[in-house]
Structures are given as C-alpha cells and as structure tokens.
Amino acid sequence: QDRVEKLQDGYDWSIVRTFCLRVIRCIDNLENRIDRLNENDESVLQLEEVRDELLFALESSGVEQYRPDIGTDYRGQEKLAEAIKEKETTREPSQVGTIAKVVRPGYRYVTDEDSYKVVRTAQVKLFG
C-alpha cells in the first residue's frame, strides 16, 4: 500500500511539475518580449499584466519564484541554482565562487513551512 502511494505521489508531482514548467515558459517568453520593447510602448504594460497574472496563478497554488541573493556563496545552493559556464570577472579574490547575477529565476513548490520541491532551478552567473 505504501509503495502504491509513493508511486502515485511521484506520478502526481510529475504532472503538476510539467504543467508548472509550461506556465513558467510562458512567463519567460513574456519577460523576453518585455525586455526587448521600449518601456514607453503601451504593449509593455499589457504584457506585464499578463505576466503578473500568471505569476499570481502559480503563487496562489503554492509555487513561488525565487532569486538567489547576489554576493552569496554558491556552494550549498546547487539544488536551487545552476551556475552557467560564463563567469563574471573580478579582481577581488573573496568574490570568486559567489553569485554575481541571477540569469533566470527559479521556482519551487512549497509543501509546508520548512520544505519545498524544486520546480525549476535558478540560473546564476558566478564571479570567477
């Protein structure tokens, strides 16, 4: 019985995660279009409203967007963020291996107050 429940939970999570990733892809596409348009363009406001509605739909379902803090050590955050190969140059040795920029936000499903399941890892650029 426990095994069946675990399989069912895994299957249900797979369906939920796949759906969330499709919504997140729409949010990413809206962000890219917003970034390419002139901020004075009227369509920017409309695109931002659609993006915000999609974010609200995720958040009200327990999925939150997160961005790792700039300047924090990347070590220990590998489950929440993936580092891209390109590095940000620095002359400060203490900055090497810390997060320089969030390239793409991550999303996680909050299961209770202290735990979550990662829907999509954030992408970060490190100082190197």
Map each language-model feature to its residues.
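Extended, amphipathic alpha-helical stalk segments that mediate dimerization
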Residues: 1-13, 18-40, 45-128
